[in-house]
């Protein structure tokens, strides 16, 4: 429903529990998310991200979508994002997020999720600042590969991102990506 509030080409960022991406029962939800949007970035966050502020260790994901009501078929990365894979340890995990490059962590151990089900437990030893640095790097890399500027969306050319202030009269998107000192992620358009 969040995508209904976003204009064409706009961005929507979700922080969700890992269950949204990992559960085979949620495959239909992931497909619905991508029926009118493109996957710009999906990052598995460490379980200890919210420990200092909320006193909880819960696995979560950052998912960034770009509204595209006229999109065609899913690309290979989006297909992976819709699929659940069984890891060698018997755990179920999102196929795309099971790749190490999409996980922000310094340690990964077999454990359980909040419901006692077998799951990978990811932690980061460098605190919020270390986590923020890695999240920023991952998102910037993903934006360079997967973000469609208004021009490229209309012309179906290569993806690009502009990380500078642009002239709003040209109907271009201004995107500012900043990791605040507290480690919060700010996306403006």
Please state what every model-predicted region is.
Residues 1, 7, 67, 133-136, ...:
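Context-gated lysine
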Residues 1-51, 58-65:
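Conserved Class I SAM-dependent methyltransferase catalytic core
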Residues 11, 41-42, 62-64, 103, ...:
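Ordered hydrophobic segments in well-structured contexts
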Residues 14, 26, 37-38, 134-135, ...:
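Generic hydrophobic/packing signal
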Residues 15, 20, 28-29, 64, ...:
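Weak global preference for isoleucine
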Residues 52-156:
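Flexible, glycine-/basic-rich loop-and-beta segments that form/coincide
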Residues 144-189:
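Charged, often flexible domain-edge or linker segments that flank or initiate folded functional domains
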